[in-house]
């Protein structure tokens, strides 16, 4: 009787898995005995119906002639961190904001906590000191903006004025919440704070700019080089 129940559970679980799209799966998500769930997942990987992302984690996405398409870097980063306030870092941030055409071999993601181990497609960057990103639950676009304001001339391909213009557009269009960005600025590096204050002032948000702690004059002068103050 138990064998029949296990077989029925496996059949039901298989149908559920095959009906899913753009979803991560673990053995614990399957309503079947652990051994049955593990065998089912392994079988579906062999059949090309699932993609093994890492130990104990699988992805059901879109099938292509080359196999199951992998999850996006954003989806994978969110799944592995389970953390608010994550977002693209480095060149990935600049590319996401259309400030660079360069695409790193591994997508870079900043995590405001101890990050998980890297995967084949995603490299995680430790931003545990920048905890306000999580407190204010920044979107990935907002995190990317802070990362660009930090990395700046190391990551942008446009000139500094054009980069600031693009960030102002994102604030004006609602793609970035300026109040959340200002709140999170408290735990950002000094040069990033200087550029953030400049951005907010030149977007007509002087009151928000004053909520961001100022950098020392020398750091501010270096950070704002090439920008009309």
Q: Which residues does each predicted region cover?
A:
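Short alpha-helix boundary/capping elements
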Residues: 49, 101, 171-175
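Short gly/ser-rich loop at a beta-strand->alpha-helix junction or flexible surface loop bordering the NTP-binding
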Residues: 52-61, 78-127
């Amino acid at each position: 009787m138990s064998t029949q129940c296990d077989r029925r559970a496996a059949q039901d679980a298989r149908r559920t898995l095959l009906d899913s799209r753009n979803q991560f799966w673990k053995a614990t998500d399957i309503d079947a005995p652990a051994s049955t769930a593990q065998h089912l997942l392994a079988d579906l990987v062999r059949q090309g119906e699932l993609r093994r992302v890492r130990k104990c984690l699988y992805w059901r996405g879109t099938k292509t002639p080359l196999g199951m398409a992998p999850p996006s870097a954003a989806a994978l980063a969110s799944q592995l961190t389970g953390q608010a306030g994550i977002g693209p870092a480095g060149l990935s941030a600049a590319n996401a904001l259309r400030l660079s055409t360069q695409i790193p071999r591994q997508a870079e993601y900043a995590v405001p906590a101890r990050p998980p181990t890297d995967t084949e497609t995603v490299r995680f960057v430790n931003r545990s000191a920048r905890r306000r990103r999580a407190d204010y639950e920044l979107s990935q676009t907002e995190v990317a903006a802070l990362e660009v304001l930090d990395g700046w001339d190391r990551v942008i391909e446009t000139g500094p004025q054009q980069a600031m213009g693009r960030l102002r557009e994102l604030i004006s269009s609602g793609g970035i919440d300026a109040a959340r960005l200002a709140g999170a600025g408290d735990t950002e590096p000094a040069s990033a704070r200087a550029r953030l204050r400049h951005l907010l002032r030149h977007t007509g948000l002087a009151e928000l700019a004053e909520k961001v702690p100022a950098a020392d004059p020398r750091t501010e002068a270096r950070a704002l080089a090439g920008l009309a103050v």
